[in-house]
Amino acid sequence: MFSLKRFILEQLIKWKESKYRKPLILKGARQIGKTYILKQFGEKNYEGVAYFNFDHDEDLYNLFSNTKDPSRILEQLSFIYGKAIIPGKTLIIFDEIQECPNALNSLKYFQEEASEYHIACAGSLLGIRLSHTSFPVGKVDFLNMYPMTFTEFLIADNCENLVEYMKSIEKVATIPDIFFNQLEEKLKAYFIIGGMPEAVKLWTEEKNIELVNNIQENI
């Protein structure tokens, strides 16, 4: 079974535990797994995850057009979520937040008036830049997410033994052929497959480069 381990989870935990925590914006290119990682983080570290996607819900978009009051917004979000949103116990996820400038701007009011609520947002780099007119400067935390690293690729491909070996060797050391050949093979695969999670998942399951190429063309 494919298991996606991203080291950015450690940074998300630090954000959760910080007493200076502000609403978080997780930035990065499309298709690198921002939504997946935020949901995974929420499921592992909170009692509930209230997920809202601005790309698919016009009513949600209109909600933020009608009020800037965090208490009113939370009341309506709880209704949509179907249960109470509890400070510190429910992670609120705003996905594709760049699609709703009013929601992006509302983060300022959440930081000032309702900072006890944990809010994490996912957005594309370009979309957030284009929303600069309503950007809550100084009122949010940022975290940049990138495609999977070689180490993350190895873990996804069930090669934890190679990861542990790489940790154990000195910066300048002769690598025995038994490890060197495996590392070289995996590194070549990583250069071809890349670090997009969907492509990596398909590669670990099928080991078929043609299928992977089809995925890459559609990313």
Language-model features and meaning:
Residues 1-17:
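N-terminal pre-Walker A segment at the start of P-loop NTPase domains
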Residues 26:
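Hydrophobic anchor at the beta1->P-loop junction of P-loop NTPases
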Residues 34:
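Conserved lysine of the Walker
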Residues 37, 41:
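Hydrophobic positions on the alpha1 helix immediately C-terminal to the Walker A/P-loop
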Residues 56-88:
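Short glycine-rich substrate-engagement loop in P-loop NTPases that contacts/grips substrate
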Residues 93, 118-124, 144, 153:
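Structural recognition of the conserved hydrophobic beta-strand(s) that form the central parallel beta-sheet
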Residues 109, 127-143, 154-159:
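Short regulatory helix/loop adjacent to the ATP-binding pocket of P-loop NTPases
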Residues 150, 155, 160-219:
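Interdomain hinge/linker elements that couple catalytic modules in large macromolecular machines
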